[in-house]
Amino acid sequence: MIIITAITLIFSMLISQDCSPGYTEVNELCFHDGDLSVIQKMIDNSYVSNIDLGCEDWDNYCGSPNPYMDDQDSWFWVTVDSVYYEWAGNNNGIVEPLELGIQEWNNGRLTSLMCGAYIYCQLSGPIPEEINQLTEATTIRLEYNYLSGFVPETLCDLEINENDYLQFDLGGNRLCPPYPSCSGEGGDFWYQDTSACTEISDVNFDYSTNILDIILLVSFVVEETYPDYQQTIASDINSDGNLDVLDIVEIVNVILEVD
């Protein structure tokens, strides 16, 4: 019995996967840390958004992200180097990166993330600015989730055909204008629910432009505090790519016109 156990241990060590630096081993497979971190950010943004989907206690599919993806009976899968793996959840109560949607990986890099219609990832919150780290991705489908906020310009760093909705689709979310040129705006299937979007100049996102926005904008201009991407877009009143005194003048004019 001891000999059999020893042989099994040695065999396991021989076939185990040694991942290169910058990669994480999961189930003896290697996954790029940067790609995993972007998916994790999507999940984190969804949890932090606290979106109200009107969930009932009995509904195991309701939540953002979809809690069913963490269920051991979930039907989602991951393809790694053309090999199909049924990737059931681990039932720990938290959706983890490799449990989200339908994914394809090649040589440790994410090449496809399917999280759109009929997959029901139910993502919410903003698209991570770090999405440009998915440098090997050729398919990103995020249509008909609950994504909100401004679309990061970094999305345009990716080599994805935004005109092919089978490769890339952001439609049917709650994303706010202005949209970058690579967003797919103007396509046949483009639609966004902008009813909850605030105006550029609403720096603190309280649905009103007032003295509080000026105070926050000044703190950005003098570098007392540093804006995140969403705040940067809302603060660049004149859309010149800089936060400076000209934006302060513009926001004052906005307030005076409102009054």
Q: Residue spans of the language-model regions?
A:
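Sec-dependent N-terminal signal peptides
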Residues: 2-16
